[in-house]
Amino acid sequence: MMLEHVLVLSAYLFSFVLYGLITSRNMVRALMCLELILNAVNLNFVTFSDFFDSRQLKGAIFSIFVIAIAAAEAAIGLAIVSSIYRNRKSTRINQSNLLNK
């Protein structure tokens, strides 16, 4: 695959998921959009690593670290969303103002 095709795919994925993150009203959907943004970035890391220096795996290794951090972020995010749902009975972002009780 050519470099331009993968970069266009990654930019397409990043831009539409960023739009989904901005317009999302549900916390779970926003968390999923954030994870997909990280996947678009990982696609760029692997593509540039393969295109410019295919003998070294720096982009792939960095991508694995980003995936591990994203997994931890998803676990913590889902725990926070679960706690907010138990207390507020809603996962809507505009109804989860924790400063006023």
UniProtKB/Swiss-Prot annotation:
Pfam family, one: Oxidored_q2
EC id: 7.1.1.-
Catalytic activity: a plastoquinone + NADH + (n+1) H(+)(in) = a plastoquinol + NAD(+) + n H(+)(out); a plastoquinone + NADPH + (n+1) H(+)(in) = a plastoquinol + NADP(+) + n H(+)(out)
Bilayer topology term: Multi-pass membrane protein
Transmembrane segments: 2-22, 32-52, 61-81
InterPro entries: NADH_UbQ_OxRdtase_chain4L/K, NUOK/Mnh_C1-like
Cystine connections: none
Keyword match Transmembrane helix: yes
Gene3D superfamilies linked: 1.10.287.3510
Keywords annotated in UniProt: Chloroplast, Membrane, NAD, NADP, Plastid, Plastoquinone, Quinone, Thylakoid, Translocase, Transmembrane, Transmembrane helix, Transport
Protein location: Plastid, Chloroplast thylakoid membrane
A GO biological-process term: photosynthesis, light reaction
Family the UniProt entry places it in: Belongs to the complex I subunit 4L family.
Function: NDH shuttles electrons from NAD(P)H:plastoquinone, via FMN and iron-sulfur (Fe-S) centers, to quinones in the photosynthetic chain and possibly in a chloroplast respiratory chain. The immediate electron acceptor for the enzyme in this species is believed to be plastoquinone. Couples the redox reaction to proton translocation, and thus conserves the redox energy in a proton gradient.
NCBIfam families from the UniProt entry: PRK05715.1-2 (NF004320)
Protein name per Swiss-Prot or TrEMBL: NAD(P)H-quinone oxidoreductase subunit 4L, chloroplastic
Organism expressing this protein natively: Guizotia abyssinica
Taxonomic lineage: Eukaryota, Viridiplantae, Streptophyta, Embryophyta, Tracheophyta
Gene transcribed to yield this protein: ndhE
